[in-house]
């Protein structure tokens, strides 16, 4: 009987260890977002420039990318020139400045240019939390009704845009046409 009492905890420990070990190799970019198919979460936040307050209603009307970024994010610095080029080509991009110092964000946008039609300031990270953001950069695709249709985790470079994301964005644009 005592031998059985020793085997059960050992078996449970090994089972937990296997699950934890397996979890180390899961790619967060491969995890589906719980927000896909749901309306963009409610929020009431200032712009980075502080000139007005935005809500989720401001994101409705046209398909867009919603890019989560921060000045402390090295990958965001790599991605930013590509976002500028996309904005110049007419891609609608909204930005969420995530858990960042607002003065640093203003300096960043002045120095590297602002690809965002709307720039939401999420200093405390609550909007990011409601979106299920793991870090930055993350980009959500929203339709004209403000529903999240897809999510991309990681740097959007020209190859990723061309090979993976451009068609998804164009499908949302085509869907919004009358």
Swiss-Prot record:
It is a single-pass membrane protein. InterPro entries: Periplasmic_diS_OxRdtase_DsbE, Redoxin, Thioredoxin-like_sf, Thioredoxin_domain, Thioredoxin_ResA/DsbE_sf. Residues 1-3 are cytoplasmic. GO terms for cellular component: outer membrane-bounded periplasmic space; plasma membrane. Coiled coil: none annotated. Its main location: membrane. It comes from the Bacteria. Residues 34-178 form the Thioredoxin domain. One of its GO terms (biological process) is cytochrome complex assembly. GO terms for molecular function: disulfide oxidoreductase activity. Residues 25-178 are periplasmic. The chain crosses the membrane at residues 4-24. Keywords: Cell inner membrane, Cell membrane, Cytochrome c-type biogenesis, Disulfide bond, Membrane, Redox-active center, Transmembrane, Transmembrane helix. It is found in: Cell inner membrane. SUPFAM superfamilies: Thioredoxin-like. Disulfide bonds join 73-76. Belongs to the thioredoxin family. DsbE subfamily. Involved in disulfide bond formation. Catalyzes a late, reductive step in the assembly of periplasmic c-type cytochromes, probably the reduction of disulfide bonds of the apocytochrome c to allow covalent linkage with the heme. Possible subunit of a heme lyase. NCBIfam families: dsbE. This is Thiol:disulfide interchange protein DsbE. It comes from Pseudomonas fluorescens biotype C. The gene is dsbE.
